Amino acid sequence: MEAIQRYLQFDRSQQLSFLYPLIFQEYIYAFARDHSLNRAILLENPGYDNKSSFLIVKRLITRMYQQNHFIISANDSSQNPFFGRNKNLYSKMISEGFSFIIEIPLSTRLISSEELKGILKSPNLRSIHSIFPFLEDNFSHFHFVLDILIPHPVHLEILFQTLRYWLKDAPSLHLLRXXXXXXXXXXXXXXXXXXXXXXXXXXXXXXXXXXXXXXXXXXXXXXXXXXXXXXXXXXXXXXXXXXXXXXXXXXXXXXXXXXXXXXXXXXXXXXXXXXXXXXXXXXXXXXXXXXXXXXXXXXXXXXXXXXXXXLWFHSERVYIKQLSNHSLDFMGYFSIVRLNPSMVRSQMLENXFLINNAIKKFDTLVPMIPLIGSLSKAKFCNLFGHPISKSARTDLSDSDIMDRFGRICRNLSHYHSGSSKKKSLYRIKYILRLSCAKTLARKHKSTVRAFLKRLGSEFFEEFLMSEEETLCLTFPRVSSPFWGVYGSRIWYLDITCINDLANQQ
């Protein structure tokens, strides 16, 4: 703190330009750590009143677009190697200001090494770097400093939705969204290697993570650019296709047509375009690309699920995510993704050499421990997986109880239908089946054995073992001269939370 006070005593103009990003830094940390806005977190910033916190945030967002204002620029070192002044403020320079704000808590000139170590070891800390992931290309050394800090990076749209309730000011929020989207689009255009561009639009009433609450087409384009911020090339045609898919009634044919319309722009970038539109708690995923790119359609669907679940899967930084066994928590369900390597040997002629082709298959597993933990929280079983009766449903009719248990079981089997190993899924079905039997036996005040003997075992097989008809996703080979259909196993995203089903009255 003494070093900070020493820097603030240099010059009055320098004090203003230095105080400005410090205030901005504090509130960004407040947004990331879910603290109240009238609470100092890292630095005691002089020169403002805590009671005027909301006004300060509004003024900061508004003055970002005002010219002739002092802003910190890391490239301009005419006055000081650490501080610079730039009078002409444009949208492309906002990223420099954000980058310098990130530099402040990591600078050894301002914060001592012990305080810095304490900040880095904070388990709840989500740095500014995670809120603005498009700054990863500007400072490469953040990959080494912040590897442990970011288990769950914050999605830009989630930040905007949080600011929307705090600021109560639509124009300033649109200014901030335009600034962040412009910098994100510039960073995405600078990336040479283009990955799969995924645009996710979720319903506001559901428990989805990313919610696009913009009516204008430009706001929808900004949401699409934010969703594909992880080294993806988002073209204007792809954004228009995403807006058209969101405007439609989320029909599978309409989504496929939208993906086919964007296939021309996606083929130029040599990447598959995946569009996921969610409406009425049902999501339809469609992808159209070349035959070689269609083989990785499962990976593209995983990228769309990652964008919807606000998890950024960076190709070089997957190890940063502190998730147990590479599991992915998506809308209340758990999924474990694994690459199964296999070897295919081929021989063209009888005396020719054997050719080894290594194949990595994208497969999903049924995670037993997270699912049993989720079922135990919903009071279907205990922590050891032993089924228990659901006392809250004893007042319902028998058909209603069986319908609710059967719906959960069908959703689970439908969600994990792409998994190759179904043994764990059958154990989960057994837990739900016996929990339903115990609930019905408790309602009729009898034992489970007597209740099953009176009704018969086929009584439960009718609604628990019969699964819904599955949807087969086929991908046409657009660029191949041989027209055909490529079918691949895929897991489904049209699922409902266990807790929502368990808490229905």
Swiss-Prot record:
MF-aspect GO terms: RNA binding
Superkingdom field: Eukaryota
Cellular component aspect of the GO annotation: chloroplast
Main location: plastid
InterPro entries, per the entry: Domain_X, Maturase_MatK, Maturase_MatK_N
Pfam families the record matches: Intron_maturas2, MatK_N
Signal peptide residue numbers: none
Function comment: Usually encoded in the trnK tRNA gene intron. Probably assists in splicing its own and other chloroplast group II introns.
PANTHER family the record matches: MATURASE K
UniProt name for this protein: Maturase K
